[in-house]
Amino acid sequence: MAKVPDLFEDLKNCYSENEDYSSEIDHLSLNQKSFYDASYEPLREDHMNKFMSLDTSETSKTSRLSFKENVVMVTANGKILKKRRLSLNQFITDDDLEAIANDTEEEIIKPRSAHYSFQSNVKYNFMRVIHQECILNDALNQSIIRDMSGPYMTAATLNNLEEAVKFDMVAYVSEEDSQLPVTLRISKTQLFVSAQNEDEPVLHKEMPETPKIIKDETNLLFFWEKHGSMDYFKSVAHPKLFIATKQEKLVHMASGPPSITDFLILEK
């Protein structure tokens, strides 16, 4: 996701190596000064720690946010934490979930000084099942099937799709991500797809029940992305890796070619 460049910070860094920074900055034109003053005006206290619409007039008391409007989350000291699209007044539909997975314009903006433990201390809350007993076919039209050698999966061309693994896709939500995290549970079981390191086979992890909250077990979570007709599953625990297939190889985690990372979801 693209980050919004901090133009004022870049300007300061550029001048920081010059002893004449203080005097030079005073010679900026009034137009330049007014630009920065307008762009970095202090945030009013009544806007701290609140969602604010970028498109709705702040003086309107009757305006309401729709699903497609942009909102921003800011901290008490005015730092922008996140820009995302969401609804504050309607139930999220399947079309909305598809829009989140397919939206390449949304951005996450986090403070540069945010500590790692702060960014990783995220809770993912169960939302609902969005696909039941679906099949995953890769770009070569191979279906994912169970591998009898262990808790693994592989891809094969099937004449009978009843032999393919059926998955239930469960959606989760958190306050820290604008993408759509999901789990892939083998239908009619409590076995969940679990991401491993690069080039290592994904595993089945048995859970006593479908987790209502996921905090430490992020290997079970994948950001579902949709580009055109193809679907991608990016690991939350390993954000550069995707579920992938490859000829004569178990289903594994990979960053891209020569492994195949694009899939087509086939409904029951």
Curated annotation (Swiss-Prot):
Positions where Phosphoserine occurs in the chain: 87
Modified residues (N6-acetyllysine): 82
Residue span of region Nuclear localization signal (NLS): 82-86
Top-level taxonomic group: Eukaryota
One GO MF term: copper ion binding
Pfam hit, one: IL1_propep
Database matches in CDD domains: beta-trefoil_IL1A
Keywords: Acetylation, Cytokine, Cytoplasm, Glycoprotein, Inflammatory response, Mitogen, Nucleus, Phosphoprotein, Pyrogen, Secreted
Entry's localization field: Nucleus; Cytoplasm; Secreted
SUPFAM superfamilies linked: Cytokine
Family matches, as InterPro entries: IL-1_alpha, IL-1_CS, IL-1_fam, IL-1_propep, IL1/FGF
Residue ranges the record assigns to the propeptide: 1-112
Annotated GO biological process: cellular response to heat; cellular response to lipopolysaccharide; cytokine-mediated signaling pathway; fever generation; immune response; positive regulation of cell division; positive regulation of gene expression; positive regulation of immature T cell proliferation in thymus
PTM field: Acetylated within its nuclear localization sequence, which impacts subcellular localization. Proteolytic processed by CAPN1 in a calcium-dependent manner. Cleavage from 31 kDa precursor to 18 kDa biologically active molecules.
Gene Ontology CC, one term: nucleus
Main location: nucleus
Glycosylation positions in this chain: 102, 141
Family designation: Belongs to the IL-1 family.
Entry domain remark: The similarity among the IL-1 precursors suggests that the amino ends of these proteins serve some as yet undefined function.
Known partners and oligomeric status: Monomer. Interacts with TMED10; the interaction mediates the translocation from the cytoplasm into the ERGIC (endoplasmic reticulum-Golgi intermediate compartment) and thereby secretion. Interacts with IL1R1. Interacts with S100A13; this interaction is the first step in the export of IL1A, followed by direct translocation of this complex across the plasma membrane.
Stated role: Cytokine constitutively present intracellularly in nearly all resting non-hematopoietic cells that plays an important role in inflammation and bridges the innate and adaptive immune systems. After binding to its receptor IL1R1 together with its accessory protein IL1RAP, forms the high affinity interleukin-1 receptor complex. Signaling involves the recruitment of adapter molecules such as MYD88, IRAK1 or IRAK4. In turn, mediates the activation of NF-kappa-B and the three MAPK pathways p38, p42/p44 and JNK pathways.
Protein name, per record: Interleukin-1 alpha
Originating organism: Ovis aries (Sheep)
